[in-house]
């Protein structure tokens, strides 16, 4: 490897690592631009789901209740709702009957 190639590789690594090292603001969720992750439907457990559908009982248990929604870049759940995870999607459901309110692609986790 020539010195020119080594310098080019070093510069490339420096630029890409600096982009990934940008700190997120502590205690806040960056909700700008998250609409691109919103899903009109998704598949979980070999079944097609959309807002208005009722999720299976298993996803209403405390084990599936996402309490640290900020770490996943999700908006705060409204009163009477909570986030759960189904088949690669984050799903906002009502506490009382498990109706799907909203769903986001799991890639929202990496949103900056």
Curated annotation (Swiss-Prot):
InterPro entries: RcnB. One of its GO terms (molecular function) is copper ion binding. GO terms for biological process: DNA damage response; response to cobalt ion; response to nickel cation; response to peptide. One of its GO terms (cellular component) is outer membrane-bounded periplasmic space. It is found in: Periplasm. Residues 1-25 form the signal peptide. Its main location: periplasm. Disulfide bonds: none annotated. The keyword Cell cycle does not apply. Keywords: Periplasm, Signal. It comes from the Bacteria. Disruption phenotype: Mutants show reduced intracellular nickel or cobalt levels. Induction: Repressed by RcnR. Induced by nickel and cobalt. Belongs to the RcnB family. Influences nickel and cobalt homeostasis. May act by modulating RcnA-mediated export of these ions to avoid excess efflux. Not involved in nickel import and does not bind nickel or cobalt ions directly. This is Nickel/cobalt homeostasis protein RcnB. It comes from Escherichia coli (strain K12). The gene is rcnB.
């Amino acid at each position: 490897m020539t010195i020119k190639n080594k310098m080019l590789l070093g510069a490339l690594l420096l630029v890409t690592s600096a982009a990934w090292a940008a700190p997120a603001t502590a205690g806040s969720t960056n909700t700008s631009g998250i609409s691109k992750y919103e899903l009109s439907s998704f598949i979980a457990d070999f079944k097609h789901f959309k807002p208005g559908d009722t999720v299976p009982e298993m996803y209403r248990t405390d084990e599936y209740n996402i309490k640290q929604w900020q770490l996943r870049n999700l908006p705060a759940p409204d009163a009477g709702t909570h986030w759960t995870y189904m088949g690669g999607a984050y799903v906002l459901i009502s506490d009382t009957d498990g109706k799907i309110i909203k769903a986001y692609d799991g890639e929202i986790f990496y949103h900056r």
